[in-house]
């Protein structure tokens, strides 16, 4: 069920990208809060989900998204290309969530509903193990896996967002997945 909600939110976010206009960004830069709300609204649910994955806490995620909203409102005049609003906003969300992680290391809740039709008991067992495994990862690994798997961001876009070469991002995602698998295997053996 939650996976369907996330899919719908991501579809809405993509639709929001198509609706971004230079005029809307310009109005927001001039202080039009309504225009800013129209810019960010399609992205909020997905941003909240990503922030929750990174911070591991609903309250911290909400604070991180709120911080990202404030930062993006204040820095909107620095957005060079209105069509890149989604990537620009995502970068701010990732930075904000990462900032919260540095101060608070907590257990991360992952949604495994997308894993398929697994028996609910097995799903809950897997969820707990994966949650503990994900929480054991370094925050940088969490960010990479969130970008790559949760947001399904192409490597080129992730590289641009993180300011890294594409090959480095590919390599780091690969190694982050290996570390997640190792942590998960350790949880299964417990």
Task: For every predicted segment, state its role.
Residues 29-30, 53-56, 66-84, 103-107, ...:
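Sigma70-family region 2
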Residues 2-12, 27, 123-124, 132-136, ...:
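C-terminal edge and immediately downstream basic/flexible tail or linker adjoining helix-turn-helix-like DNA-binding
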